[in-house]
């Protein structure tokens, strides 16, 4: 019976404490700015139901406030507590009145650098970031300075670095603080030989992917770049390049071992999609990321939709000198088109030499052969072409599948002449640009521009794939896909020799991954620039940032067009650049 009475007493005490806690609110007065923010951070671990007016809780709050102020140089605050009665409706308020007191000021920042750090520009630059004498102490500055010393060591290869001394001295009587740091970076390590394990690709190709030479000073960014370059080849399923520290302590020359595992020899991808331009589409792709020890690769794909059916291949041959940025590419395929007033069967074969520059630009020279049998409107022709061309392009982006910043630029020139067997003389210039910029996180702007020009004396022999048509999702919305072009006398589309289109789109982040869009597109496809016929479309849309890329739905109408006035809608999935 006595035990039961004791248990009941304990229970009543617990319930009483909980009731008090639930009826008391903590409030801090006397602080502002960074001091208030720091103290709030220290107090954030206290739950609202833990607040009580007792001495133990007040001591806990007192300690938290002092820690928050101490970090910013206030070591001798005055803290008084006052328990106020509740307002008409509410809880009692425990007030902590804080007077920060006199701050501790920086009295000296003594930092001694030894080893390679004495002459290293990054370490010397770091010395200039020390707080000035007389400024209020911030312990975070001191800790961040030490972290920066260590960070430079890891980044630049001072792997034997150590702090001989690291003290933050406080003289409370003087209200002064003194840094006292003695740091020895030791000798900087250098890159040694890179050994690869598990690779199916010849070693000389892998060695030419290494972005540094033996004996170069260590830089962590160079090691990261080697990992990136190996992964970018597409040859490997996994890549890990790691330094061998146990072999470098005496010589300070750091050998590296790259452990790789080959990617699966064959991969097959299938997909079903829909776009307003071509309707439902089925696509299948077969990839061989490596075919031999020279790193050759093959991609074959087929795509089937109602107006277009394609079958193509791409065979890539990296060059030993620079396997990632320089390569030959042989491409070929067959395409059948039945769209609007175009019916064509086209067979192509292209040999290209590519250079990917460190600036991000990609250059290529092409030699193209094609055989086209086509009916464009009222004209039927068979044309064989053999012509060279040059191309330069660059794509940059930041922010994932729906970039917050980016641009894509592509320029090409092709030239055909009957002197080497082509059926028609022509020169073609094309330019495409897309720019994406985001302001204040929620405001996104997308602009597009396209320019095309064909110069020829026999336009009827130019295949439809080289002629210009406007209209559609990536051209002028409000019009059907490839529906804008000069026409024959019977009203059938002929195609144009000149093209210019532009688009301005504004997107607003409504919530989460959802964006609203408004846009205006304009341009023309003509054969005589003296007979300008600009078309303009405008509309609204929705964007969803899905895990596989942006999905969009647009509604657009032509502007001031007496012949076209219906509503067009566009559904699409895929990158904007």
Swiss-Prot record:
Residues 277-278, 307-308, 337-346, 371-386, 416-427, 454-499, 524-535, 558-567 are extracellular. It comes from Escherichia coli (strain K12). Its main location: membrane. It is found in: Cell outer membrane. This is Translocation and assembly module subunit TamA. Residues 244-577 are annotated as: Sufficient for outer membrane targeting. Residues 187-263 form the POTRA domain. TAM-mediated outer membrane protein folding is significantly inhibited by darobactin, which acts as a competitive inhibitor of beta signal binding. It comes from the Bacteria. Component of the translocation and assembly module (TAM), which facilitates the insertion and assembly of specific beta-barrel proteins into the outer membrane. Promotes the assembly and secretion across the outer membrane of a subset of autotransporters, such as Ag43. Involved in the assembly of the outer membrane usher protein FimD. In vitro, when TAM is reconstituted into preformed liposomes, it can promote the assembly of several outer membrane proteins, including OmpA, EspP, Ag43 and FadL. The keyword Signal applies. The lineage of its organism: Bacteria, Pseudomonadati, Pseudomonadota, Gammaproteobacteria, Enterobacterales. The chain crosses the membrane at residues 265-276, 279-288, 297-306, 309-317, 327-336, 347-356, 361-370, 387-395, 406-415, 428-437, 444-453, 500-508, 514-523, 536-545, 549-557, 568-577.
């Amino acid at each position: 019976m006595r035990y039961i009475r004791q248990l009941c007493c304990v229970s009543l005490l617990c319930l009483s404490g909980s009731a008090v806690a639930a009826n008391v609110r903590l409030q801090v007065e006397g602080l502002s700015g960074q001091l208030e923010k720091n103290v709030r951070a220290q107090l954030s671990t206290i739950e609202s139901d833990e607040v009580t007016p007792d001495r133990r809780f007040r001591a806990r709050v007192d300690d938290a406030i002092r820690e928050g102020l101490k970090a910013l140089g206030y070591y001798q605050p005055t803290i008084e507590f006052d328990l106020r009665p509740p307002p008409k409706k509410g809880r009692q308020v425990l007030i902590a009145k804080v007077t920060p007191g006199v701050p501790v000021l920086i009295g000296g920042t003594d930092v001694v650098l030894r080893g390679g750090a004495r002459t290293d520009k990054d370490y010397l630059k770091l010395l200039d970031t020390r707080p000035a004498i007389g400024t209020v102490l911030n312990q975070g500055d001191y800790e961040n300075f030490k972290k920066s010393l260590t960070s430079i060591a890891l980044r630049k290869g001072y792997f034997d670095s150590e702090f001989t001394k690291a003290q933050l001295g406080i003289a409370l009587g003087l209200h002064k603080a003194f840094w006292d740091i003695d740091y020895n970076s030791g000798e900087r390590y250098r890159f040694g030989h890179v050994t690869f394990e598990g690779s199916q690709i010849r070693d000389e190709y892998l060695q030419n992917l290494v972005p540094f030479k033996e004996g170069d000073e260590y830089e962590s960014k160079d090691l990261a770049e080697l990992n990136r370059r190996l992964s970018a080849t597409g040859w490997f399923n996994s890549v890990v390049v790691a330094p061998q520290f146990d072999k470098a302590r005496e010589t300070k020359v750091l050998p590296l071992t790259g452990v790789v595992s080959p990617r699966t020899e064959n991969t097959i991808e299938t997909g079903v999609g829909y776009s307003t331009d071509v309707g439902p589409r089925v696509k299948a792709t077969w990839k061989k990321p490596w075919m031999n020890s020279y790193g050759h690769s093959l991609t074959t794909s087929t795509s089937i939709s109602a107006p277009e059916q394609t079958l193509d291949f791409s065979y890539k041959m990296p060059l030993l000198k620079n396997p990632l940025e320089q390569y030959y590419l042989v491409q070929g395929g067959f395409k059948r088109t039945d769209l609007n007033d175009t019916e064509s069967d086209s067979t192509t074969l292209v040999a290209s030499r590519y250079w990917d520059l460190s600036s991000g630009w990609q250059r290529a020279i092409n030699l193209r052969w094609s055989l086209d049998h086509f009916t464009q409107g009222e004209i039927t022709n068979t044309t064989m072409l053999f012509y060279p061309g040059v191309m330069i392009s660059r794509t940059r982006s930041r922010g994932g599948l729906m970039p917050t910043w980016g641009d894509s630029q592509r320029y090409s020139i092709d030239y055909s002449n009957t002197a080497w067997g082509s059926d028609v003389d022509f020169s073609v210039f094309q330019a495409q640009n897309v720019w994406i910029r985001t302001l204040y996180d929620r405001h996104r702007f997308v602009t597009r521009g396209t320019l095309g020009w064909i110069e020829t004396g026999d336009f009827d022999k130019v295949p439809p794939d080289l002629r210009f048509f406007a209209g559609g999702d990536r051209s002028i919305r409000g019009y059907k896909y490839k529906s804008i072009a000069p026409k024959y006398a019977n009203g059938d589309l002929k195609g144009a020799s000149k093209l210019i289109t532009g688009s301005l789109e504004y997107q607003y982040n409504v919530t989460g991954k959802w964006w609203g869009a408004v846009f205006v597109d304009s341009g023309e496809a003509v054969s005589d620039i003296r007979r300008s016929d600009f078309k303009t479309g405008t509309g609204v849309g929705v964007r969803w940032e899905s895990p596989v890329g942006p999905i969009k739905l647009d509604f657009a109408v032509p502007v001031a067009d007496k012949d076209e006035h219906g509503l067009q809608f566009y559904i699409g999935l895929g990158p904007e650049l």
